[in-house]
């Protein structure tokens, strides 16, 4: 069984902060940010919350799929920046959309979260436990970054994306995933009110990242996991139509394409507009591509996420 994508939706805040505006807050400039990351601007929450954005994206996915909220069995929200620790964001979404028969929970795996949530939903569907699943990625990273740290605050934006999956007979989704907790310190985030009592306090408050370590990890592990995933199905990378990677940095995506010896046109990007929206980046891009009718039935699509944990995951399905 496969969970076929029946509908997608996304939401980004109206407030746009471009690189020039950022240069008023920290010592940076548009040229540096564009050259090192490919980012030109980001959408930043004002009154919005993570759950508000998740609900808006979910409503659009529902509308597009023509599925009734009461038909949904499962709601998964990939987020590491929910405004409440509990209740989980998925239960807030359930209430707001009226998905009265669904069970909902959040998956916190930072930028890898959406791919892991998508895999979880696919596994439930393939096991015939649930038929209809709503998978959302939603994050308000600008709430967690230190706006005085130029090495991290320039990278992130806010948003949410959702996909509505329905069970159909078909080739199951291929999946691979890994974590390496020994490298956890390369990318950490604490809530704003966290009172750390260790000597590392200053370093681990807000988002703290060893940018180069994360960059090297991504460039090595993403091609590796894609090859691992496809080898299991005896597929070559050239048979894949689209590689939809977590939108962290244009140079990471270019390096992955180069390592796989593939044309960059197979690697759609929208990070210039939204920056790194963590768990939301892949579903926002999926929604944009679907609305622009970029997918044909039968297209082979790879999703790949990577980030804090450190963790990385990939999956492949036919559209
Ligand atoms: O979702 C997954 C999460 N994270 C990532 O994917 C991030 C992965 N890493 C990266 O994308 C890159 O490492 C960064 C974009 C964060 C940094 O790029 P880099 O090419 O690794 O730069 P760097 O850290 O080596 O810094 C080069 C220089 C330094 O100055 P010096 O020491 O050479 O004088 C930095 O202080 O650039 C300086 N710098 C900046 N300059 C202007 C660092 N941040 C900025 C800035 N504006 N915002």
Where are the language model's segments positioned?
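Acidic, glycine-rich active-site loops and adjacent beta-strand->loop/helix elements
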Residues: 11, 78-83, 109-112, 137-142, ...
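Conserved catalytic cysteine-centered active-site region
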Residues: 34-36, 40-52, 79-133, 258-285
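Buried hydrophobic positions in well-ordered alpha/beta secondary-structure cores of metabolic enzymes
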Residues: 5-7, 33, 61, 75, ...
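Catalytic phosphate/nucleotide-handling subdomain of diverse soluble enzymes
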Residues: 287-304, 316-319
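Condensing-enzyme catalytic core mediating Claisen C-C bond formation in acyl metabolism
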Residues: 1-47, 149-216, 220, 224, ...
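Conserved beta-ketoacyl condensing-enzyme motif
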Residues: 5-7, 47-108, 229-230, 235-253, ...
């Amino acid at each position: 069984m496969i969970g076929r994508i029946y509908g997608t939706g996304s939401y980004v805040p109206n407030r746009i902060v471009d690189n020039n505006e950022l240069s008023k807050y920290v010592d940076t400039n548009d040229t540096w940010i564009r050259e090192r990351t490919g980012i030109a601007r980001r959408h930043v929450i004002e009154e919005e919350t993570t759950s508000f954005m998740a609900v808006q994206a979910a409503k659009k996915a529902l509308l597009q799929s023509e599925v009734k909220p009461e038909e949904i069995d499962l709601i998964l929200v990939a987020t590491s920046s929910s405004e409440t620790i509990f209740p989980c964001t998925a239960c807030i979404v359930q209430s707001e959309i009226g998905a009265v028969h669904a069970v909902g929970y959040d998956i916190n795996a930072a930028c890898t979260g959406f791919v892991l949530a998508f895999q979880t939903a696919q596994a439930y569907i393939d096991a015939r436990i649930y038929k209809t699943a709503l998978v959302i990625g939603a994050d308000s990273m600008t709430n967690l970054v230190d706006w005085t740290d130029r090495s991290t605050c320039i990278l992130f934006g806010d948003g949410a994306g959702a996909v509505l999956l329905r069970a159909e007979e078909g080739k199951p989704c291929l999946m691979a995933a890994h974590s390496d907790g020994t490298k956890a310190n390369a990318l950490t985030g604490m809530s704003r009110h966290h009172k750390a009592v260790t000597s590392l306090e200053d370093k681990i408050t807000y988002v703290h990242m060893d940018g180069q370590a994360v960059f090297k990890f991504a460039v090595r592990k993403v091609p590796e996991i894609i090859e691992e995933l496809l080898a299991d199905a005896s597929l070559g990378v050239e048979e894949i139509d689209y590689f939809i990677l977590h939108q962290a940095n244009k140079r990471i995506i270019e390096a992955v394409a180069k390592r796989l010896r593939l044309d960059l046109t197979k690697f759609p990007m929208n990070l210039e507009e939204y920056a790194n929206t963590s768990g939301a980046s892949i579903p926002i891009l999926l929604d944009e591509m679907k609305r622009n009718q970029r997918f044909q039935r039968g297209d082979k699509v790879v999703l790949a996420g990577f980030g804090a944990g450190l963790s990385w995951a990939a999956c492949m399905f036919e559209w």
